[in-house]
From Swiss-Prot:
<dbReference type="GO" id="GO:0071004">
    <property type="term" value="C:U2-type prespliceosome"/>
</dbReference>
<comment type="function">
    <text>Involved in pre-mRNA splicing.</text>
</comment>
<feature type="repeat" description="LRR 3">
    <location>
        <begin position="75"/>
        <end position="95"/>
    </location>
</feature>
<dbReference type="Pfam" id="PF14580">
    <property type="entry name" value="LRR_9"/>
</dbReference>
<comment type="subunit">
    <text>Associated with the spliceosome.</text>
</comment>
<dbReference type="InterPro" id="IPR032675">
    <property type="entry name" value="LRR_dom_sf"/>
</dbReference>
<dbReference type="GO" id="GO:0030620">
    <property type="term" value="F:U2 snRNA binding"/>
</dbReference>
<keyword id="KW-0747">Spliceosome</keyword>
<dbReference type="GO" id="GO:0000974">
    <property type="term" value="C:Prp19 complex"/>
</dbReference>
<keyword id="KW-0677">Repeat</keyword>
<feature type="repeat" description="LRR 2">
    <location>
        <begin position="53"/>
        <end position="74"/>
    </location>
</feature>
<protein>
    <recommendedName>
        <fullName>U2 small nuclear ribonucleoprotein A'</fullName>
    </recommendedName>
</protein>
<keyword id="KW-0508">mRNA splicing</keyword>
<keyword id="KW-0507">mRNA processing</keyword>
<feature type="domain" description="LRRCT">
    <location>
        <begin position="132"/>
        <end position="170"/>
    </location>
</feature>
<dbReference type="GO" id="GO:0005686">
    <property type="term" value="C:U2 snRNP"/>
</dbReference>
<comment type="similarity">
    <text>Belongs to the U2 small nuclear ribonucleoprotein A family.</text>
</comment>
Amino acid sequence: MKFTPGAVEDAPSYYVDHDNGKYNTQKCVILRNLGLEGDDIAMPASLNHLAKPTHILDLTNNDLVFFPDLHHRDDIETLLLSKNRLMVLDAALLPSKLKSLSLAFNGIENFETLIPLSHCPSTVRDLVLIGNPICHLSEYRQRILALVPSLEVLDFKLVSQAEKAQAVKDHVAVMKKIKEDNRQIHQRKKKALAAEVDGKNTFGRNTKSLTEAAKVTKPRDKTIEVMNTVVGKLTEEKKKKIREQLANASSMEELERLERLLTGGV
């Protein structure tokens, strides 16, 4: 189901003392187990109705594929997003003073998906990724700490001083590699979108899909179906404008906007 203002306003809430140890001073809002889906219209409009202050936002066990845009909220310290279907982890959308983030059981399989977490707020101290296939990969812990060197706890285990020191050293090299990888992904994604607009590529059939080009490993059947339908209905004039925007796109954000346009906001 989509987010609605009513669902947010009527969400159960209670007070806890998880972070500061002071009795019942932190408000936790519960929006879990509702099958909530993210979009660019209903979700942000509905979350504008989220009570202030809210210190803990529980969105566990929904159908979100990207982070809700909470970058303007400096009151939310804990964000619980376990058991969703997260594929796009844009850290720029996270609350500005976030301390704890749970992404457990989201089917995250590769480090590329987690690269945007390198831009997490510097306040993030606690990250949970347990239950994701990536946890079983070689050097998992070391690589995550290099991405987010501010962490003090990873998967409920304290980060040692030795780990923290190594993470700080690795961070510079990791960021350099990320920059180059992003450049290559940007080019592949731009080509894939342009091919789709030109009718030379139908996702999921005879060439590499946009999903593969962007290194997203989860199936996106609904997105593929809608994109093919939307592109098929575009006029030549509209296609020309989109081609021009693609040619001038210089950031992943611009490409994501164009992708959402072609998928009807799915």
